[in-house]
Structures are given as C-alpha cells and as structure tokens.
Amino acid sequence: MSGIPHDHYEPKTGIEKWLHDRLPIVGLVYDTIMIPTPKNLNWWWIWGIVLAFTLVLQIVTGIVLAMHYTPHVDLAFASVEHIMRDVNGGWAMRYIHANGASLFFLAVYIHIFRGLYYGSYKAPREITWIVGMVIYLLMMGTAFMGYVLPWGQMSFWGATVITGLFGAIPGIGPSIQAWLLGGPAVDNATLNRFFSLHYLLPFVIAALVAIHIWAFHTTGNNNPTGVEVRRTSKADAEKDTLPFWPYFVIKDLFALALVLLGFFAVVAYMPNYLGHPDNYVQANPLSTPAHIVPEWYFLPFYAILRAFAADVWVVILVDGLTFGIVDAKFFGVIAMFGAIAVMALAPWLDTSKVRSGAYRPKFRMWFWFLVLDFVVLTWVGAMPTEYPYDWISLIASTYWFAYFLVILPLLGATEKPEPIPASIEEDFNSHYGNPAE
C-alpha cells in the first residue's frame, strides 16, 4: 500500500480465501494496521489518533443532541435548556460535544504545526497536506454553524458578523449573503440551513479523513528526520520500520488515554471555561453585545480579519488602486482566507531540499517565532479593536504572511542545514542504541 516492501495478507482458511476473492476487506484492514511505520516517530505523532477519536466522539454526541434539538428561532434556546435539564445525561452530551470541538481544534493545530516543523507537506506528500487543509476549512465551517445553533446572544451576533463577510465581496456579495441566510437577515431560515449543514459536514469530513489516511499510507509516513524509509529491499525496510500494530497502536492508545483524562476533567469541573456567558442569554436582535467574540479556535484568523483597518497604508493603497472595489472590509476577508491559503501553499513556498526542521537551525528560529505569533494572534483576537491591540494584531498578521511568502522561500536559498542521518535506522540507533548489539 505504501510501496515499502513488507508482508501482505495471505488468507489461510477456505472461508478466508472465499471472502478475500469477493471482498478483500480483511486484507485491507490487515495492510492498514500492519503497515510499516518509521520506528523513530516521537510523541508529536500521537495527535492523529486523538483527532480520529474526537471526530467519532463529535459525530456520536452530535447525533444524540440532534434527537432533542429543535431548529426554530422560538424553540432552539429552550430545546438546549431542555437537553441540559430534562434529558438523561443531556448535560454530559452537550458539554462533551462543546468541549470536544475545542479538543478537535487543539489537536489539529498541534498536528498542523508539527507538519510545518517536520516538513510533512513536502514531496511526495503534497496531496496529504492539501486534503488536510480542506478538512481544516470544513472543520471551521462546521464549528461556526454549530456555534449558532444554541441561539444565544453570541450565536446570533456571531452569525450576523461572519455571514456579513460574504456581503463584502464586490458585486455578488449581497446576493451570496442573502442566499446563505435564506433572507435579508439571520433568522429561522438561517438556523434551519445551519442545522442541516452542521449535521451533514462531519460525514464529509470523515470521508476526507479516509482519503487523508489513504494518501499518507500510499506515500508512507513522514518522521522526525524527514529521511525516507529505504525501499531497496524488505530487509532494509525492516531496519527502518516497525509494524503499526502493536507498537504504535499501543503508544497512541496510551497517549489518547492521557489526553482524555485532561479532557474529561475539563468537561466535569469547568465545562464552560472556554465558552462565553452571553450565550446563556437568548438571542435578541435588538440588543448587541458589547464585545462580539468567536470561539477561541477562530481567534487567530479573526485577529487577522480585523487587523487591516481603513487607516492602514496598504489598505489605503489597494483601495485607491482598485477604485474602492477592495475596501477595508473586503481586504480583511481576503487577508483572513489568505492566511489559511498560504499554509496550503507551503509545499511550493518552502524551497529547502531538507525536509525536517530538526536539521535547519535558521528555520527553527523563524518557526518558533511563528508559533509565538499564532499565540499572540489568539490573544489579540479576543481583545477589543483599540490601541495597542490593533497595532499588535497588524504586526502579528504581517509576520504570518512574511513567514510563508518571504522567509520560507529565502531560507531555502540562504540556509546551510546540518548533516542529516543516512537512514532512519542510523537516527534510531543514535538515540536508543543498536538492539542487535
């Protein structure tokens, strides 16, 4: 499956042979869980199983919640309170689902930044990376629509602000916005549409996750060195790899148990810590909250959206050159989606021949600045648009684009990487010793 020489499934009994000839599902499962995996994978590689588990958790709890939820502006808020008070275990389902979204995004951000550090986007894994970024976009859309469903103050006004971004598109924007809303403003049609899509999209995400896994099983997994598994012979491949089962499955399950211990501690003891108190007030179109804040996992890109105000020189320049077509609001929308797009383009923006950041000293420095930059954007995204937060968000947004569009391409031409190991086996033995000795 991965092109790495290894033992494949061979049916032994007559029933196994009969089934394998007609539906080779046992062989598919065998080749999936026994796939040769680089033996030097570290703890940064445990977040894939966390993401897979959380996706299943979100789908299951979401289905249960949908059984008791009513997508109507007059009943939605009350139906959520009904779930909390009258449905057996309803409070647990809701808190697991709400905090599960936070765990999902925390895991995906770690997963993305791990990929950026170890060069998991480089050839031949570009398709894996692109599919992953599409999954991330669908996650954002699903989470946004789910946040609207409780029909609290922050739900309603968050929907008003975010759908208003589509209205900023010149010419066709207002029509797209009205089509999304189902009318001139956020109302019952909007709630019904968002509920339908929020129910549907997790299954689309699950299908893309299967493609994502298929893609990296085809190319083989990346690893901390960025060195490819030797494929010249089965003997060489076995020196670089271990079967996914039982070695990495057991490690991943242990890590998952630790993550879930922390997750359920949050669910049990501080389930509303990451929420907003305004969302416990029923939506009121006549009363605007003092400060509209999205969920924490949207804050970095929300900060970029707000960073490019009308008085920023580049916005003034673009506004003038386009004769007002690209105004500050539309520029912010472009910047927000552009910040995600530059991540998707990383395979072509990074010109270095060395895959892993572990052997790129200058890259490491700029990368950790990027991580700090992401944290700063998360912080200022929750702050009001006033001095000094507006300036901090502008500087942080500028660095985000500079890293991908300027620093990454230049590093490939100017950086002198450190020596990389000749094989995964060499790297493994340097850390843990040669098991043959």
UniProtKB/Swiss-Prot annotation:
Tell me what the record says results from residue 144 to L/S: Loss of binding affinity for ubiquinone and ubiquinol
Q: Does the keyword Iron apply?
A: yes
- Kindly state which keywords UniProt assigns to this record, in alphabetical order: Cell membrane, Electron transport, Heme, Iron, Membrane, Metal-binding, Respiratory chain, Transmembrane, Transmembrane helix, Transport
Recorded GO cellular component terms are: plasma membrane; respiratory chain complex III
- Cofactor binding description: Binds 2 heme b groups non-covalently.
The keyword Cell membrane is assigned to this record? yes
* Bilayer topology annotation: Multi-pass membrane protein
**What are the BP-aspect GO terms?**
respiratory electron transport chain
Cross-referenced Gene3D superfamilies: Cytochrome Bc1 Complex, Chain C
Q: Where are the transmembrane segments?
A: 45-65, 100-120, 129-149, 156-176, 194-214, 248-268, 298-318, 330-350, 365-385, 391-411
What cofactors does this protein use? heme b
Which sites bind heme b b562?
97, 198
Q: Name the protein family.
A: Belongs to the cytochrome b family.
Q: What does this protein do?
A: Component of the ubiquinol-cytochrome c reductase complex (complex III or cytochrome b-c1 complex), which is a respiratory chain that generates an electrochemical potential coupled to ATP synthesis.
Residues that bind heme b b566: 111, 212
Q: Which organism is it from?
A: Rhodobacter capsulatus (strain ATCC BAA-309 / NBRC 16581 / SB1003)
The miscellaneous annotation reads:
Heme 1 (or BL or b562) is low-potential and absorbs at about 562 nm, and heme 2 (or BH or b566) is high-potential and absorbs at about 566 nm.
In terms of SUPFAM superfamilies, this protein maps to: a domain/subunit of cytochrome bc1 complex (Ubiquinol-cytochrome c reductase), Transmembrane di-heme cytochromes
Record protein name field? Cytochrome b
Q: Name one GO molecular function term.
A: metal ion binding
Where does it reside?
Answer: Cell membrane
Quaternary structure annotation from Swiss-Prot or TrEMBL: The main subunits of complex b-c1 are: cytochrome b, cytochrome c1 and the Rieske protein.
